[in-house]
Amino acid sequence: LKSKREQLSSPAPNTVPWEALVGNAIGGDGRDITTPEDVDKDTIALIMYTSGTTGKPKGAMLSHGNLFSNLMQGKAWVPGLGDKPERMLAALPFFHAYGLTMNVTLAQFIGGELVILPKPDMSLIMQLMKKHTPTWVPGVPTLYERIVKAAEDQEIPIKGVRAAFSGASTLPSDTVKKWESYTGGLLVEGYGL
């Protein structure tokens, strides 16, 4: 059992440890990091685990090509995204493909700033909306409905939001109208069941 624990807690083969990645990147542009192998679009970048809603949970292997394609599709929904400095409200969990793509990888790709929420708490969201004025808000319909209601109730202007991207469930047309009227920005539906 001890040897199994040591094996599971030791560095994974053919990987760059997080500490080395961050440590090298702080002092330079990250180009000095040696990767353990050649990386191309078909190389597995990460494994995300499913919730098991239609069966047992399983690891979905995502390649570098998958991540890049998702990133480019997300960016294409909002023409001009990244042409100006962007500040993104990161209310989605990063352990989900939607949050990882529309917040983490997209922010890195366009050089955007992430305003990260430790938990989905409306009072915190509104404090951050007021303090940081995000320009990009990926989320779910309920998030947009609650932000507009809280902004109306607390008289917090949210006019700086240029674009929002909705997923996870169907986006009601009333939500789009209220959001776009209140923010002056665009709200598009990407994928909703």
Indicate where each model-derived feature is located.
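Alpha-helix capping/helix-boundary segments
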Residues: 121, 142-144, 171
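Conserved S/T- and glycine-rich ATP-binding loop of Class I adenylate-forming
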Residues: 44, 50-53, 88, 94, ...
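Gly/Ser/Thr-rich phosphate-binding loop
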Residues: 134-139, 148-193
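Conserved AMP-binding/adenylation subdomain of ANL enzymes
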Residues: 68-87, 95-135, 146, 150-151
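Conserved AMP-binding
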Residues: 91-96, 169
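ANL superfamily adenylate-forming
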Residues: 1-41
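Conserved adenylate-forming
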Residues: 26-43, 47-90, 110-112
